[in-house]
Amino acid sequence: MASSSPILLMIIFSMWLLISHSESTDYLIGDSHNSWKVPLPSRRAFARWASAHEFTVGDTILFEYDNETESVHEVNEHDYIMCHTNGEHVEHHDGNTKVVLDKIGVYHFISGTKRHCKMGLKLAVVVQNKHDLVLPPLITMPMPPSPSPSPNSSGNKGGAAGLGFIMWLGVSLVMMMFLI
């Protein structure tokens, strides 16, 4: 019975590692409060913001805005490009819109005011599956040196998820050694 306590502790620890690295992330649009408004720093401000993040299924994006002057419309790609605010769209007018990214693909959001959308108040978010992890090969061949990558200001969630999986795998292997 004494040997089952360490095994139980390892199982609990490995489950904690797995769960803690698979949680979703909440993103505040523009990384600041009340940023869904005009004027924008540039017409491509939200495009740059979105490209600096890696969105996965289950993540949430939060639009904070003045609901007396703004709204958020979820639209298709054509209406996104043309800034069409009329039609079959999901419209949000609450000033604190939370959207769960529940499927893989591209989500398109525009301001409910066409003039604001034309000024750049629109956002396209590419969502990937968080379970698309690439496992490293068991045997690696030396790679020729490559140029240094440019610095990246945002973190990479995929690396954290991969690290969590590798840690879980290592703990599982240690547990198996105790069971055999």
UniProtKB/Swiss-Prot annotation:
Molecular functions per Gene Ontology: electron transfer activity
InterPro entries: Cupredoxin, Phytocyanin-like, Phytocyanin_dom
A Pfam family: Cu_bind_like
Top-level taxon: Eukaryota
Residues linked to a glycan: 67, 152
Phytocyanin domain location: 25-129
Protein's GO biological process: nodulation
Residues lipid-modified (GPI-anchor amidated serine): 154
PANTHER family xref list: BLUE COPPER PROTEIN, EARLY NODULIN-LIKE PROTEIN 10
Family membership: Belongs to the early nodulin-like (ENODL) family.
Protein name: Early nodulin-16
Lineage: Eukaryota, Viridiplantae, Streptophyta, Embryophyta, Tracheophyta
